[in-house]
Amino acid sequence: GSVARYKQPDSFENVPSSKDLPESDAVMIDSAELIANQANAVTSGLPRYIEAARYWMQYSGIPDSIYNYTNSKNDYVDDYAARGIWVNYLAGGSAANPNEPGLGIPLHASLAFHTDAGIRDEVVGTLIIYKDHDDEKNKKYPTGKSRIVARDLADYMQTQIVEDMRAIYAPEWTRRQLNNSSYAEARHPKVPAVLLELLSHQNPTDMKYGLDPRVRFTISRAMYKSFLKFIH
């Protein structure tokens, strides 16, 4: 089973046990030692890739400085706070984020894909969030571009999703707010980032569409189209 939602030992780090070991072997050994140290942990029974982002990062060999945001004090905060920091780690050392160490991947943008809560008789619909400054109140990305360009991405994505849903499946699909709000997944990334609340997972009318594989394809295509518009 998978270790999930369990307080991590303060001393654990994703570093090789031996300099002679390949990195992949070291990560496997560290992960096995962690599980052995948590013999009484409750396991989720789920594949690692659908557990919390915090645990996916840990068992993928991402440095603990990325995923252990609260120094093992709060898994919930670690989970959402680490996602934008992980984006910065991926882009670190590239033209997109040249001033931080990382994997050198020149990312164009970041998407945090969520469903929302809320119940009503009709469709709850789609909300999207961006943030015009980061934790240090910077209003520009490392590239020099204004962070307000994240609003363009948010507008493209929300518009495309709502228009496609209305045209193909649900003329009543609701376009909710486009918010400049301080959420970690919109605020932390050093590339244009949006947080999408596609629909309400509590609302039967929304989930009638959310469980339809045809709708899922349409939504995925709409997101893809919006990224292309933004990049070009």
Predicted regions and their residues:
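Catalytic-core regions of hydrolytic enzymes
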Residues: 1-124
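Second-shell loop/turn segments in exported
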Residues: 35-44, 69-77, 98, 139-148, ...
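Glycine-rich, acidic and aromatic/proline-enriched surface loops and short helix-turn segments
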Residues: 51-63, 159-163, 187-192
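Active-site-adjacent mobile loop/cap segments within catalytic or ligand-binding domains
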Residues: 110-139, 168-232
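Solvent-exposed, polar/charged alpha-helical surfaces in well-ordered, non-transmembrane soluble domains
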Residues: 51-55, 85, 89, 151, ...
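Active-site-adjacent substrate-binding region
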Residues: 146-179, 187
